[in-house]
């Protein structure tokens, strides 16, 4: 485990709080730990954290880990391997971890665990935690790809993990924007729509397939971008994750133009 001094140095350089950097550091080691565990072959890393840890190391900071479970594995087996991983990281890297049974959420389509930790800032165990979410029975449109995990910290190790493609992350974000009011989804979608690495001709059909599997109406995308809750939560939800947060109005204007350009605002269910 790195020192509190290194956390503070990174926080100063990144213009973020020490707590944000500490959580990012802990998330990184949890990801590396799972990438070194028997669970690796059953995981597809996804979401905003995958954008930062797999594709774009300078991207916004995140607060949780999101995976889709592939293949056949029981939830109890997942929990057992996560617990073993936490014990191994505690012994090898000096963390303290706790996975309270009362903070394990089981649903038909997901398994969520909250992991309390003591990291370099040495806060009391139970005062800080990270969420690790496992989605079950998810339909993937694109193949899972093995990618190296980015870590900019001094004690990094080299590991790969199965991850969503950028195209898969984009189609999930399109559905997420329709299904919930969460500013980070809009921020991520705006970012992804501007990336030349993405094979955009594949996206309309992939979006339609993903939306059908999630029982989401793709025709509601434009309506979803106009929800008043976005403006109320834009700054409070994102200011601690983004160095220079753009104005929501600018983001929405550019995003709608790009969505229209790629034929994503005219899709019908």
Task: Place the predicted regions along the sequence by residue.
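Structured mid-to-C-terminal alpha-helical surface segments
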Residues: 1-43, 53-65, 69-269
